[in-house]
Amino acid sequence: PLRWEEGNQTRIMDWLPDDDENILVMIRMSNARSPDVIKLNVKKNSIKTVKKGVAGVGYWMTDEDGRVRIGNTYDRNRSSGSIIFQEEGSTKWRTIWDYSSFGEDSVSVLGFGKEPNKVWYEAYKDGRIAVFSADISKQNIEPELVYSHPKRDVETYLRYRKDKKDPIGIG
């Protein structure tokens, strides 16, 4: 069902550890500029579209239960981006962060934890990249500093234990 097309990259975005038959893959199918999220059944070789591509969204992210909840947008004419978020149980998306590309207001979501609306993300603090967490379901997002270093950027990816949904560290 997935055919190769020159220039079309796919990305496994979620291995769905609680599902032995499926993985989630980002691939441009319905929109040449924005990836769809498909559920690929690796045993039956079948696919199902989970999230159609949306103009301007270049990357999707799932929560720890395999639901598409975050989208990253980019506007090359304005050199700006935004992060959109879908609340658990809602069909509506809302912008939670706007930022300029390569500016100190940029934000990058690293992942979710067990709580469905809590994310860990990287952002600048005192001129260096640091790691924060926040409940993004709130209208006024209140960042909580997780870790920063006084002299250099923090290496930012989350580490998880296989049996836990909350991150256990960064590195």
Tell me the role of every PLM-derived stretch.
Residues 1-171:
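Beta-propeller folds
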